[in-house]
Amino acid sequence: QRNTEYIEQTHAVSLIEKVVNGHRKRPLVLTADRGRGKSSALGIACAQLLQHKPLRILLTAPSINAVEPVYQHAQRLLTDAKQMKKDRLEVGYGYIQFIAPDELLSSLPECDLLLVDEAAAIPVPMLKQITEHYHRLVFSSTIHGYEGCGRGFTLKFIEWLQQQRPGMKTYHMQQPIRWSVDDKLETWLYDAFILNAELSPQSIEGMANVSLNKVDKQALVHQPNLLRECFALLVNAHYQTSPNDLLHLLRDDNSSVYLAMDKQNIIGVILTVEEGGLDDELIEAVQLGQRRPKGHLTPITIINQLGLVKVGKLITSRVMRIAVHPDLQGSGIGKRMLTLLEESVGAHVDYLSTSFGATDELIQFWQQAGYQSIRLGTMRDAASGCYSLLMVRQLANKSQTWIDDTQALFHEFLSASLSLVYPKLEPSLARSLLRQPIQHQTLHPTKRVLLQSYAQGGASYESIFVWLQQWLRQHGLGPVSDLMISKVFLNHDWGICAKQFGLSGRKQVEQQLRSELEKLLSQFTV
């Protein structure tokens, strides 16, 4: 590696090693364009560290496929390494172990070094939790291409990290390894697939001039600058935006593109797909699990998982993507775009829907736009690490009574199934989804007396937790702590709760629960 083309990579390797050998709480943020040797730098650093001592190295990323090059480069240099499984490489008593972000935060395993690859694709709240629990950390991310940084990582997280960890280091790798310097083929590839789509700075004077226009997709092909700006917004906002999305965007007759404009400037984009309108025969086949027609995610889920067969005949416009220029995020433009979309969809559309990887921020955004949760997927998405949430919205001129009924059933199902189906759900997500009180439920007076007794040191947790769960759901989980949700709804073990919240054991956990319950009982008098 004496060649000059490896100078930056060699420096990156030394910075990674310094995270282990230097002071604690001085994380490294490593960024690079595609083909700059970022993943190989991680692998080389792991190998060189393991050659000197048996370290416990944990590697997390949105999916294990994203970190395969790290293992390959480490194994190339470690001749005595044993690949135990796809996710584990052992060298003597040391190892490199992959762990999914959600599992990392639920089990909090000890390690000597934690590498967080493609960090931009991991929700910012999870990155903050990782920072608080682990003190020898490397965050790495691509900043161009479809794995590229969203502004949430580059702005929100890195700014927060600089405040929390003043000794942090950042290093950006620019030197090409996969390509020659100024390689014409790389330039062509980036242009062809809009891999380097950049956004120009934007500002607006107010909402009055914001409009939403459905665009002719063929016109996009003939206006490359318009297409580039539209796609730049999508790449910036969504980690999973890929070349296939570009083709889908241009070819699919059922999908539509809406551009939010302020005067002549593009400030946002919405992609929708029309679904539903299924016939009786197909609906029955979907209900029985015999058919799953492509392009009908919302009606298939509602028919097969929720049992509402008649909804399959209705037409929905599902929002696949919504992106707002990062300079303008948080100013209400996204909500305004969704309001304008309701006015723009065809008269034949019966309701709106959306499905996305659930985070607190996104749930709050869609709830504020009037969308209601009706189904939470049972498996985390491999790329985002999030559960998929299906939400629907009534149109002003088309009442859909089934939506309120379905949301009530969703709340009932979720609160009863959290510990069985979603034991690793983040407590904050449970709070976001079960925030609304159940007005028609009241607690039997005897149950309340028991809760009062427990709050003051009597009864036992095992004798009251069912009534506690009922009472908390009655009032909604808005004011309920993460600890209370973890124990009462997710049924986490006492030891896990203690470890997660920095307490010594069951006794301290119960003290916290009793104290919080006493405050909540005085806050809610029924």
Across the structure, where does each feature detected by a protein language model lie?
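Conserved beta-hairpin
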Residues: N254-T272, D280
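Conserved acetyl-CoA-binding loop-helix of GNAT-fold acetyltransferases
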Residues: S40-I44, R321-S344
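N-terminal pre-P-loop "Q-motif" helix
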Residues: R2-R26
